[in-house]
C-alpha cells in the first residue's frame, strides 16, 4: 500500500521554510508538528488522497471534489500522483510545477511526498472557491 508523507503549506509558510528546501520534510519531522500538519498515511490502491486524509480524521481543504477548483491542490515533492480528468490546472502547472488535486489524485508510487493546502500559492488563488 502506498505511503504519503504530507506537510501543510500553511505550516511551511508559518515556519519560514521554502518549498524548494532539500530537507523540508526532515525539518517538518523534527518540528513537533501535530498529525494534521505533518505526518504519513497509507493510501489504498486507487483511493484518493483527500479521502485517505479524511479517513484519518483530518480536515484538509476541498470544495468541488471533481477537479474543477484548486481548493485541494498539493505540490508533489517526491513520487507521482495520477489524477482523474481535471479542467482547472494548466499543463505547465501539472508538468513543471507538480501541482496535483488531492480530491481526484491517487499515489502512483510506493512513496509520495506532498505539500497539501497549496491553494495559498499566488498562481492558484484565482481558482479557489
Swiss-Prot record:
Keywords: 2Fe-2S, Acetylation, Electron transport, Iron, Iron-sulfur, Metal-binding, Transport. Its cofactor is [2Fe-2S] cluster. It comes from the Archaea. The gene is fdx. Residues 29-120 form the 2Fe-2S ferredoxin-type domain. It comes from Halobacterium salinarum (strain ATCC 700922 / JCM 11081 / NRC-1). Pfam families: Fer2. Belongs to the 2Fe2S plant-type ferredoxin family. This is Ferredoxin. The modification N6-acetyllysine is found at residue 119. Ferredoxins are iron-sulfur proteins that transfer electrons in a wide variety of metabolic reactions. [2Fe-2S] cluster binds at residues 64, 69, 72, 103. Binds 1 [2Fe-2S] cluster. GO terms for molecular function: 2 iron, 2 sulfur cluster binding; metal ion binding.
Amino acid at each position: 500500500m502506498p505511503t504519503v508523507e504530507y506537510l501543510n503549506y500553511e505550516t511551511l509558510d508559518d515556519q519560514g521554510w521554502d518549498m524548494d528546501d532539500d530537507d523540508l520534510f526532515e525539518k517538518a519531522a523534527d518540528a513537533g508538528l501535530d498529525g494534521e500538519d505533518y505526518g504519513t498515511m497509507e493510501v489504498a490502491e486507487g483511493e484518493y488522497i483527500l479521502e485517505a486524509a479524511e479517513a484519518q480524521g483530518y480536515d484538509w481543504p476541498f470544495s468541488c471534489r471533481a477537479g474543477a477548483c484548486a481548493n485541494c491542490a498539493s505540490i508533489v515533492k517526491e513520487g507521482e500522483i495520477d489524477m482523474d480528468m481535471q479542467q482547472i490546472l494548466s499543463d505547465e502547472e501539472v508538468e513543471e510545477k507538480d501541482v496535483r488535486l488531492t480530491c481526484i489524485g491517487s499515489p502512483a508510487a510506493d512513496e509520495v511526498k506532498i505539500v497539501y493546502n497549496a491553494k495559498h500559492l499566488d498562481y492558484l488563488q484565482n481558482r479557489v472557491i
